[in-house]
Amino acid sequence: MRSGFLSGARRLWARRAFSRTPPPSEELLARGGPLRAFLERRVGSEAGGLDAGYPQLAAAARLLSEKERELRDTESLLHDENEDLKKLAESEIALCQKQITELKHQIISLLVPSEEMDGSDLILEVTAGVGGQEAMLFTSEMFDMYQQYAAFKRWHFETLEYFPSELGGLRHASASVGGPEAYRHMKFEGGVHRVQRVPKTEKQGRIHTSTMTVAILPQPTEIKLVINPKDLRIDTKRASGAGGQHVNTTDSAVRIVHLPTGIISECQQERSQLKNRELAMKKLRARLYSMHLEEETAKRYNARKIQVGTKGRSEKIRTYNFPQNRVTDHRINKSLHDLESFMQGDCLLDDMIQSLKDCSDYEALVEMISRRD
Protein backbone atom coordinates (compact mmCIF):
# COMPACT_ATOMS: atom_id res chain seq x y z
CA MET A 1 0.00 0.00 0.00
CA ARG A 2 2.74 2.40 0.98
CA SER A 3 4.87 1.58 -2.06
CA GLY A 4 2.03 2.55 -4.42
CA PHE A 5 1.58 5.84 -2.58
CA LEU A 6 5.30 6.50 -2.64
CA SER A 7 5.81 5.77 -6.34
CA GLY A 8 2.83 7.93 -7.29
CA ALA A 9 4.03 10.80 -5.13
CA ARG A 10 7.52 10.53 -6.59
CA ARG A 11 6.13 10.74 -10.14
CA LEU A 12 4.30 13.93 -9.18
CA TRP A 13 7.42 15.24 -7.49
CA ALA A 14 9.54 14.58 -10.58
CA ARG A 15 7.21 16.77 -12.63
CA ARG A 16 7.14 19.42 -9.92
CA ALA A 17 10.94 19.52 -9.66
CA PHE A 18 11.00 20.35 -13.37
CA SER A 19 8.18 22.89 -13.49
CA ARG A 20 8.56 24.24 -9.92
CA THR A 21 5.02 25.58 -9.92
CA PRO A 22 2.42 25.30 -7.11
CA PRO A 23 -0.05 24.20 -5.82
CA PRO A 24 0.95 20.64 -4.82
CA SER A 25 -2.09 19.88 -2.63
CA GLU A 26 -4.47 19.97 -5.62
CA GLU A 27 -2.49 17.19 -7.33
CA LEU A 28 -1.72 15.05 -4.31
CA LEU A 29 -5.35 15.03 -3.15
CA ALA A 30 -6.98 14.71 -6.57
CA ARG A 31 -9.38 11.78 -6.87
CA GLY A 32 -7.37 8.70 -7.82
CA GLY A 33 -4.12 10.35 -6.74
CA PRO A 34 -1.61 8.52 -4.51
CA LEU A 35 -2.30 10.46 -1.33
CA ARG A 36 -6.06 10.32 -1.84
CA ALA A 37 -6.01 6.55 -2.36
CA PHE A 38 -3.88 6.14 0.75
CA LEU A 39 -6.26 8.22 2.88
CA GLU A 40 -9.38 6.46 1.62
CA ARG A 41 -7.92 3.03 2.38
CA ARG A 42 -6.87 4.08 5.87
CA VAL A 43 -10.20 5.71 6.66
CA GLY A 44 -12.07 2.64 5.47
CA SER A 45 -9.94 0.08 7.33
CA GLU A 46 -11.30 -1.36 10.54
CA ALA A 47 -7.95 -2.05 12.19
CA GLY A 48 -5.29 0.62 12.43
CA GLY A 49 -7.41 3.20 10.67
CA LEU A 50 -6.96 6.96 10.91
CA ASP A 51 -9.76 7.22 13.49
CA ALA A 52 -7.58 5.50 16.08
CA GLY A 53 -4.61 7.86 15.95
CA TYR A 54 -5.67 10.80 13.81
CA PRO A 55 -9.39 11.51 14.35
CA GLN A 56 -9.16 15.08 13.03
CA LEU A 57 -7.48 13.91 9.83
CA ALA A 58 -10.03 11.11 9.39
CA ALA A 59 -12.92 13.55 9.83
CA ALA A 60 -11.43 15.96 7.26
CA ALA A 61 -10.88 13.13 4.75
CA ARG A 62 -14.49 11.96 5.10
CA LEU A 63 -15.84 15.49 4.78
CA LEU A 64 -13.76 16.00 1.63
CA SER A 65 -15.35 12.92 0.03
CA GLU A 66 -18.81 14.15 1.01
CA LYS A 67 -18.22 17.62 -0.44
CA GLU A 68 -16.90 16.20 -3.70
CA ARG A 69 -19.98 13.97 -3.97
CA GLU A 70 -22.16 16.99 -3.27
CA LEU A 71 -20.30 18.93 -5.98
CA ARG A 72 -20.89 16.21 -8.59
CA ASP A 73 -24.58 16.02 -7.75
CA THR A 74 -24.95 19.81 -7.95
CA GLU A 75 -23.09 20.04 -11.27
CA SER A 76 -25.74 17.84 -12.87
CA LEU A 77 -28.28 20.61 -12.21
CA LEU A 78 -26.43 22.96 -14.58
CA HIS A 79 -28.18 21.22 -17.48
CA ASP A 80 -31.63 21.84 -16.05
CA GLU A 81 -34.00 23.99 -18.11
CA ASN A 82 -35.08 25.98 -15.06
CA GLU A 83 -32.90 29.14 -15.05
CA ASP A 84 -33.50 29.86 -11.35
CA LEU A 85 -32.37 26.35 -10.47
CA LYS A 86 -29.26 26.75 -12.63
CA LYS A 87 -28.32 30.01 -10.88
CA LEU A 88 -28.80 28.37 -7.50
CA ALA A 89 -26.62 25.46 -8.65
CA GLU A 90 -23.85 27.84 -9.77
CA SER A 91 -23.84 29.49 -6.36
CA GLU A 92 -23.72 26.12 -4.58
CA ILE A 93 -20.91 24.91 -6.85
CA ALA A 94 -18.76 27.96 -6.06
CA LEU A 95 -19.28 27.40 -2.33
CA CYS A 96 -18.48 23.68 -2.63
CA GLN A 97 -15.29 24.34 -4.58
CA LYS A 98 -14.12 26.80 -1.95
CA GLN A 99 -14.83 24.32 0.86
CA ILE A 100 -13.04 21.53 -1.01
CA THR A 101 -9.93 23.68 -1.46
CA GLU A 102 -9.95 24.60 2.24
CA LEU A 103 -10.32 20.94 3.24
CA LYS A 104 -7.39 19.92 1.04
CA HIS A 105 -5.18 22.55 2.65
CA GLN A 106 -6.36 21.40 6.09
CA ILE A 107 -5.49 17.77 5.31
CA ILE A 108 -2.03 18.73 4.03
CA SER A 109 -1.37 20.82 7.16
CA LEU A 110 -2.41 17.87 9.35
CA LEU A 111 -0.13 15.50 7.45
CA VAL A 112 2.98 17.68 7.19
CA PRO A 113 5.16 17.53 10.31
CA SER A 114 5.73 20.94 11.88
CA GLU A 115 9.24 22.33 12.09
CA GLU A 116 10.54 22.54 15.63
CA MET A 117 10.66 26.34 15.62
CA ASP A 118 7.54 27.15 13.58
CA GLY A 119 5.74 28.64 16.57
CA SER A 120 8.71 30.74 17.65
CA ASP A 121 9.46 34.44 17.53
CA LEU A 122 12.50 35.52 15.52
CA ILE A 123 15.38 37.92 15.05
CA LEU A 124 15.33 39.65 11.65
CA GLU A 125 18.64 40.92 10.25
CA VAL A 126 19.08 42.92 7.04
CA THR A 127 22.49 43.77 5.57
CA ALA A 128 23.43 45.73 2.45
CA GLY A 129 25.34 43.66 -0.11
CA VAL A 130 26.81 44.41 -3.54
CA GLY A 131 25.91 47.76 -5.08
CA GLY A 132 27.12 50.50 -2.76
CA GLN A 133 24.63 53.25 -1.94
CA GLU A 134 21.89 51.70 -4.09
CA ALA A 135 22.18 48.46 -2.08
CA MET A 136 21.86 50.47 1.15
CA LEU A 137 18.77 52.28 -0.11
CA PHE A 138 17.19 48.94 -1.03
CA THR A 139 18.10 47.51 2.37
CA SER A 140 16.27 50.39 4.03
CA GLU A 141 13.19 49.74 1.87
CA MET A 142 13.27 46.03 2.72
CA PHE A 143 13.51 46.71 6.45
CA ASP A 144 10.50 49.03 6.16
CA MET A 145 8.63 46.36 4.18
CA TYR A 146 9.13 43.77 6.91
CA GLN A 147 8.12 46.24 9.61
CA GLN A 148 4.90 46.90 7.67
CA TYR A 149 4.38 43.15 7.20
CA ALA A 150 4.67 42.66 10.96
CA ALA A 151 1.99 45.33 11.44
CA PHE A 152 -0.16 43.62 8.77
CA LYS A 153 0.13 40.30 10.68
CA ARG A 154 -0.34 42.13 14.01
CA TRP A 155 3.05 40.99 15.27
CA HIS A 156 5.33 42.78 17.70
CA PHE A 157 8.31 44.51 16.01
CA GLU A 158 11.19 45.96 18.07
CA THR A 159 14.28 47.45 16.40
CA LEU A 160 17.50 46.17 18.00
CA GLU A 161 20.12 47.74 15.72
CA TYR A 162 19.95 50.43 13.05
CA PHE A 163 23.07 51.62 11.22
CA PRO A 164 22.13 54.11 8.48
CA SER A 165 24.47 55.26 5.73
CA GLU A 166 25.49 58.88 5.32
CA LEU A 167 23.26 59.35 2.26
CA GLY A 168 20.03 57.95 3.63
CA GLY A 169 20.33 54.20 3.09
CA LEU A 170 20.83 51.43 5.62
CA ARG A 171 24.02 49.44 6.15
CA HIS A 172 22.63 46.96 8.66
CA ALA A 173 19.66 46.60 11.00
CA SER A 174 18.09 43.96 13.19
CA ALA A 175 14.75 43.59 14.92
CA SER A 176 12.94 41.25 17.28
CA VAL A 177 9.68 40.03 15.71
CA GLY A 178 7.07 38.14 17.69
CA GLY A 179 3.56 36.87 17.13
CA PRO A 180 1.51 33.81 16.16
CA GLU A 181 3.58 31.60 13.82
CA ALA A 182 5.97 34.46 13.06
CA TYR A 183 8.94 32.19 12.30
CA ARG A 184 6.76 29.80 10.27
CA HIS A 185 6.03 32.62 7.83
CA MET A 186 9.27 34.59 7.90
CA LYS A 187 11.69 31.65 7.59
CA PHE A 188 11.23 31.69 3.80
CA GLU A 189 12.60 35.26 3.58
CA GLY A 190 16.15 34.28 4.54
CA GLY A 191 18.62 34.69 1.66
CA VAL A 192 19.97 37.13 -0.91
CA HIS A 193 17.45 39.55 -2.45
CA ARG A 194 18.39 41.25 -5.74
CA VAL A 195 17.10 44.61 -7.00
CA GLN A 196 17.28 45.88 -10.58
CA ARG A 197 16.45 49.54 -11.22
CA VAL A 198 17.76 52.87 -12.49
CA PRO A 199 19.25 54.87 -9.59
CA LYS A 200 18.11 58.46 -9.21
CA THR A 201 21.71 59.59 -9.73
CA GLU A 202 22.09 57.61 -13.00
CA LYS A 203 22.12 60.12 -15.87
CA GLN A 204 22.48 57.54 -18.68
CA GLY A 205 19.35 55.62 -17.66
CA ARG A 206 21.27 52.39 -17.12
CA ILE A 207 19.79 49.67 -14.93
CA HIS A 208 21.94 48.79 -11.92
CA THR A 209 21.84 45.49 -10.04
CA SER A 210 22.32 45.47 -6.26
CA THR A 211 21.80 42.95 -3.49
CA MET A 212 20.98 42.75 0.19
CA THR A 213 20.83 39.83 2.60
CA VAL A 214 18.06 38.81 4.98
CA ALA A 215 18.78 36.49 7.92
CA ILE A 216 15.97 34.95 9.97
CA LEU A 217 17.03 33.55 13.35
CA PRO A 218 14.48 31.60 15.40
CA GLN A 219 13.89 33.07 18.85
CA PRO A 220 11.92 30.53 20.90
CA THR A 221 10.32 31.67 24.14
CA GLU A 222 12.64 29.42 26.11
CA ILE A 223 15.89 28.54 24.38
CA LYS A 224 17.28 25.34 25.84
CA LEU A 225 20.86 26.48 25.43
CA VAL A 226 23.47 26.67 28.17
CA ILE A 227 26.03 29.47 27.76
CA ASN A 228 28.98 29.39 30.11
CA PRO A 229 29.70 32.94 31.38
CA LYS A 230 33.42 32.10 31.11
CA ASP A 231 32.94 31.78 27.33
CA LEU A 232 31.86 35.41 27.02
CA ARG A 233 33.84 38.62 26.68
CA ILE A 234 31.66 41.66 27.33
CA ASP A 235 32.90 45.10 26.31
CA THR A 236 31.21 48.46 26.73
CA LYS A 237 31.79 51.59 24.71
CA ARG A 238 30.20 54.92 23.97
CA ALA A 239 27.33 54.87 21.51
CA SER A 240 27.93 56.30 18.05
CA GLY A 241 25.56 57.86 15.54
CA ALA A 242 22.45 59.95 16.10
CA GLY A 243 21.44 60.55 19.69
CA GLY A 244 22.07 64.14 20.72
CA GLN A 245 23.77 64.66 24.06
CA HIS A 246 23.61 60.94 24.79
CA VAL A 247 26.23 60.14 22.13
CA ASN A 248 29.82 59.83 23.44
CA THR A 249 28.82 60.72 27.01
CA THR A 250 28.03 57.29 28.51
CA ASP A 251 29.37 53.79 27.92
CA SER A 252 25.95 52.43 27.00
CA ALA A 253 26.84 50.39 23.89
CA VAL A 254 27.50 46.70 24.58
CA ARG A 255 29.55 44.20 22.58
CA ILE A 256 29.49 40.50 23.52
CA VAL A 257 31.91 37.97 22.01
CA HIS A 258 31.25 34.23 22.32
CA LEU A 259 34.84 33.00 22.47
CA PRO A 260 34.35 29.33 21.37
CA THR A 261 32.57 30.30 18.12
CA GLY A 262 33.76 33.87 17.58
CA ILE A 263 30.15 35.06 17.22
CA ILE A 264 29.77 38.77 18.05
CA SER A 265 26.59 40.46 19.20
CA GLU A 266 26.31 44.22 19.64
CA CYS A 267 23.60 46.62 20.72
CA GLN A 268 23.54 50.39 21.21
CA GLN A 269 19.88 51.04 20.45
CA GLU A 270 18.88 51.90 24.03
CA ARG A 271 20.24 54.57 26.38
CA SER A 272 20.54 52.03 29.18
CA GLN A 273 23.65 49.82 29.22
CA LEU A 274 21.66 47.17 31.10
CA LYS A 275 18.95 47.12 28.42
CA ASN A 276 21.55 46.98 25.62
CA ARG A 277 23.27 44.09 27.35
CA GLU A 278 19.96 42.25 27.62
CA LEU A 279 19.19 42.78 23.92
CA ALA A 280 22.73 41.83 22.83
CA MET A 281 22.49 38.64 24.88
CA LYS A 282 19.11 37.88 23.30
CA LYS A 283 20.66 38.20 19.83
CA LEU A 284 23.65 36.06 20.80
CA ARG A 285 21.42 33.26 22.11
CA ALA A 286 19.38 33.38 18.90
CA ARG A 287 22.52 33.15 16.73
CA LEU A 288 23.95 30.25 18.72
CA TYR A 289 20.63 28.46 18.64
CA SER A 290 20.30 29.10 14.90
CA MET A 291 23.75 27.58 14.35
CA HIS A 292 22.69 24.48 16.28
CA LEU A 293 19.35 24.33 14.44
CA GLU A 294 21.02 24.62 11.02
CA GLU A 295 23.29 21.67 11.83
CA GLU A 296 20.31 19.55 12.86
CA THR A 297 18.23 20.70 9.90
CA ALA A 298 21.03 19.85 7.45
CA LYS A 299 21.15 16.32 8.86
CA ARG A 300 17.39 15.76 8.69
CA TYR A 301 16.44 17.62 5.51
CA ASN A 302 19.46 17.34 3.26
CA ALA A 303 17.31 16.93 0.14
CA ARG A 304 14.97 19.88 0.68
CA LYS A 305 14.69 22.22 -2.32
CA ILE A 306 13.04 25.23 -0.69
CA GLN A 307 15.57 27.39 1.17
CA VAL A 308 14.60 27.79 4.78
CA GLY A 309 16.05 30.23 7.28
CA THR A 310 19.64 31.26 6.74
CA LYS A 311 20.83 28.23 4.72
CA GLY A 312 22.47 28.87 1.36
CA ARG A 313 22.43 32.63 1.60
CA SER A 314 24.82 32.94 -1.36
CA GLU A 315 21.94 31.86 -3.60
CA LYS A 316 19.69 34.67 -4.85
CA ILE A 317 16.16 33.79 -3.83
CA ARG A 318 14.19 36.74 -5.22
CA THR A 319 14.55 39.54 -7.79
CA TYR A 320 12.82 42.93 -7.60
CA ASN A 321 12.80 44.39 -11.14
CA PHE A 322 11.50 47.96 -11.00
CA PRO A 323 11.56 48.76 -14.77
CA GLN A 324 9.33 45.72 -15.38
CA ASN A 325 7.25 46.30 -12.21
CA ARG A 326 7.95 42.65 -11.37
CA VAL A 327 9.04 40.59 -8.37
CA THR A 328 10.10 36.99 -9.04
CA ASP A 329 10.82 34.29 -6.48
CA HIS A 330 13.31 31.94 -8.14
CA ARG A 331 12.66 29.01 -5.78
CA ILE A 332 9.11 28.49 -7.09
CA ASN A 333 9.38 30.49 -10.34
CA LYS A 334 6.51 32.75 -9.31
CA SER A 335 6.22 36.36 -10.50
CA LEU A 336 3.93 39.18 -9.42
CA HIS A 337 3.53 42.36 -11.46
CA ASP A 338 2.75 45.01 -8.86
CA LEU A 339 6.08 45.74 -7.22
CA GLU A 340 4.98 48.93 -5.50
CA SER A 341 2.13 47.13 -3.71
CA PHE A 342 4.43 44.19 -2.89
CA MET A 343 6.85 46.54 -1.11
CA GLN A 344 3.98 47.74 1.11
CA GLY A 345 4.37 44.47 3.01
CA ASP A 346 0.77 43.32 3.12
CA CYS A 347 -1.40 41.04 0.94
CA LEU A 348 0.99 40.43 -1.98
CA LEU A 349 3.96 39.58 0.24
CA ASP A 350 1.70 37.33 2.31
CA ASP A 351 0.54 35.60 -0.89
CA MET A 352 4.14 34.96 -1.98
CA ILE A 353 5.04 33.54 1.43
CA GLN A 354 1.96 31.27 1.34
CA SER A 355 3.02 29.92 -2.07
CA LEU A 356 6.47 29.15 -0.66
CA LYS A 357 4.86 27.43 2.30
CA ASP A 358 2.66 25.32 0.00
CA CYS A 359 5.68 24.09 -1.98
CA SER A 360 7.66 23.47 1.19
CA ASP A 361 4.77 21.43 2.63
CA TYR A 362 4.70 19.35 -0.55
CA GLU A 363 8.43 18.64 -0.33
CA ALA A 364 8.18 17.78 3.37
CA LEU A 365 5.30 15.39 2.67
CA VAL A 366 7.14 13.54 -0.10
CA GLU A 367 10.24 13.36 2.09
CA MET A 368 8.20 12.03 5.02
CA ILE A 369 6.77 9.32 2.76
CA SER A 370 10.26 8.42 1.51
CA ARG A 371 11.50 7.89 5.06
CA ARG A 372 8.62 5.49 5.70
CA ASP A 373 9.25 3.46 2.58
UniProtKB/Swiss-Prot annotation:
The modification N5-methylglutamine is found at residue 245. One of its GO terms (molecular function) is translation release factor activity. It is found in: Mitochondrion. Residues 56-110 form a coiled coil. Gene3D superfamilies: 3.30.160.20, 3.30.70.1660, 6.10.140.1950. Disulfide bonds: none annotated. The keyword Transferase does not apply. Residues 1-25 form a transit peptide. Methylation of glutamine in the GGQ triplet by HEMK1 is conserved from bacteria to mammals. InterPro entries: PCRF, Pep_chain_release_fac_I, Pep_chain_release_fac_I_sf, Prokaryotic/Mito_RF. GO terms for biological process: mitochondrial translational termination. Mitochondrial peptide chain release factor that directs the termination of translation in response to the peptide chain termination codons UAA and UAG. Belongs to the prokaryotic/mitochondrial release factor family. The GGQ domain interacts with the peptidyltransferase center (PTC) of the large ribosomal subunit to trigger nascent chain hydrolysis. PANTHER family: LD18447P, PEPTIDE CHAIN RELEASE FACTOR 1-LIKE, MITOCHONDRIAL. This is Peptide chain release factor 1-like, mitochondrial. It comes from Mus musculus. The gene is Mtrf1l.
